[in-house]
């Protein structure tokens, strides 16, 4: 399969997977126009849409795309049933698309019904995990988001994290505000900054690398624990996650 990204809005990415025959699945099409152009440019044949959650910048283009391609199956969680989803899916389900099985698992936190789609090595994680960060808690709790990230963290090292937003540089700035002397984060920040200066995307990233630069996946890391302990003593990793998320919200 071939992985493609379509920029949308200010910082969204609409992901598209296509096979050698040109059949494709579209992930979180927040608007239709750039998707329709890409379909025309590449001569793709849309087969399905994956929706991760109900926010408009992820579902806004679904109904228009269905007008052009009514044969498409639109998979999504229950919270997307009025956003164009034709097949509701949830935790533990598997869907066969383009000849590949995609496992679906619940990742509440950003929204209560948020889900991810995984077919090795591709993980479409919407607004749950970003490179260097994680989604804001609009509906769920810090504990729910922590548990969702821990699910993702069990996936293979070479998993490709296909997040829905270009937030990497800002997330790394936050990480360096907490661990300013972390050599790996500093090195990666320089690389990411060079990419963004050239208007190049920083995604997808592999999970092995993400475990090193994403503080939200490092809540049991001794350097991070020592830094948090300067302000407050938190015994549980989920409490340290909540502390980080609160800090990021006001960064």
Curated annotation (Swiss-Prot):
<comment type="similarity">
    <text>Belongs to the metallo-beta-lactamase superfamily. Glyoxalase II family.</text>
</comment>
<dbReference type="Pfam" id="PF00753">
    <property type="entry name" value="Lactamase_B"/>
</dbReference>
<dbReference type="InterPro" id="IPR050110">
    <property type="entry name" value="Glyoxalase_II_hydrolase"/>
</dbReference>
<dbReference type="InterPro" id="IPR035680">
    <property type="entry name" value="Clx_II_MBL"/>
</dbReference>
<dbReference type="InterPro" id="IPR017782">
    <property type="entry name" value="Hydroxyacylglutathione_Hdrlase"/>
</dbReference>
<dbReference type="InterPro" id="IPR032282">
    <property type="entry name" value="HAGH_C"/>
</dbReference>
<keyword id="KW-0862">Zinc</keyword>
<protein>
    <recommendedName>
        <fullName>Hydroxyacylglutathione hydrolase</fullName>
        <ecNumber>3.1.2.6</ecNumber>
    </recommendedName>
</protein>
<dbReference type="GO" id="GO:0046872">
    <property type="term" value="F:metal ion binding"/>
</dbReference>
<dbReference type="InterPro" id="IPR001279">
    <property type="entry name" value="Metallo-B-lactamas"/>
</dbReference>
<dbReference type="InterPro" id="IPR036866">
    <property type="entry name" value="RibonucZ/Hydroxyglut_hydro"/>
</dbReference>
<keyword id="KW-0479">Metal-binding</keyword>
<comment type="function">
    <text>Thiolesterase that catalyzes the hydrolysis of S-D-lactoyl-glutathione to form glutathione and D-lactic acid.</text>
</comment>
<feature type="binding site">
    <location>
        <position position="58"/>
    </location>
    <ligand>
        <name>Zn(2+) 2</name>
    </ligand>
</feature>
<feature type="binding site">
    <location>
        <position position="57"/>
    </location>
    <ligand>
        <name>Zn(2+) 2</name>
    </ligand>
</feature>
<dbReference type="Pfam" id="PF16123">
    <property type="entry name" value="HAGH_C"/>
</dbReference>
<dbReference type="GO" id="GO:0004416">
    <property type="term" value="F:hydroxyacylglutathione hydrolase activity"/>
</dbReference>
<feature type="binding site">
    <location>
        <position position="53"/>
    </location>
    <ligand>
        <name>Zn(2+) 1</name>
    </ligand>
</feature>
<feature type="binding site">
    <location>
        <position position="127"/>
    </location>
    <ligand>
        <name>Zn(2+) 1</name>
    </ligand>
</feature>
<feature type="binding site">
    <location>
        <position position="110"/>
    </location>
    <ligand>
        <name>Zn(2+) 1</name>
    </ligand>
</feature>
<feature type="binding site">
    <location>
        <position position="55"/>
    </location>
    <ligand>
        <name>Zn(2+) 1</name>
    </ligand>
</feature>
<comment type="subunit">
    <text>Monomer.</text>
</comment>
<feature type="binding site">
    <location>
        <position position="165"/>
    </location>
    <ligand>
        <name>Zn(2+) 2</name>
    </ligand>
</feature>
<dbReference type="GO" id="GO:0019243">
    <property type="term" value="P:methylglyoxal catabolic process to D-lactate via S-lactoyl-glutathione"/>
</dbReference>
<comment type="pathway">
    <text>Secondary metabolite metabolism; methylglyoxal degradation; (R)-lactate from methylglyoxal: step 2/2.</text>
</comment>
<feature type="binding site">
    <location>
        <position position="127"/>
    </location>
    <ligand>
        <name>Zn(2+) 2</name>
    </ligand>
</feature>
<keyword id="KW-0378">Hydrolase</keyword>
């Amino acid at each position: 399969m071939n992985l493609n990204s379509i920029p949308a809005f200010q910082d969204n990415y609409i992901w598209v997977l296509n096979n050698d025959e040109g059949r494709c699945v579209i992930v979180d099409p927040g608007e239709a126009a750039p998707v329709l152009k890409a379909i025309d440019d590449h001569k793709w044949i849309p087969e399905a849409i994956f929706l991760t959650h109900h926010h408009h910048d992820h579902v806004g283009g679904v109904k228009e795309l269905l007008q052009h391609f009514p044969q498409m199956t639109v998979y999504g969680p229950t919270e997307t049933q009025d956003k164009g989803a034709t097949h509701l899916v949830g935790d533990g389900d598997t869907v066969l698309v383009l000849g590949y099985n995609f496992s679906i698992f619940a990742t509440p936190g950003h929204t209560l019904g948020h889900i991810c789609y995984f077919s090795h090595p591709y993980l479409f994680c919407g607004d749950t995990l970003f490179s260097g960060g994680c989604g804001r808690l609009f509906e769920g709790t810090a504990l729910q988001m922590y548990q969702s990230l821990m699910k993702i963290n069990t996936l293979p090292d070479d998993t490709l994290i296909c997040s829905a937003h270009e937030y990497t540089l800002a997330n790394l700035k936050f990480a360096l505000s907490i661990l300013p002397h972390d050599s790996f984060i500093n090195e990666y920040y320089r690389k990411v900054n060079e990419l963004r200066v050239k208007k190049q995307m920083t995604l997808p990233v592999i999970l092995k690398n993400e475990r090193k630069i994403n503080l939200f996946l490092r809540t049991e890391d001794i350097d991070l624990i020592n830094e948090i302990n300067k302000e407050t003593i938190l015994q549980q990793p989920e409490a340290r996650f909540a502390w980080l998320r609160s800090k990021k919200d006001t960064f």
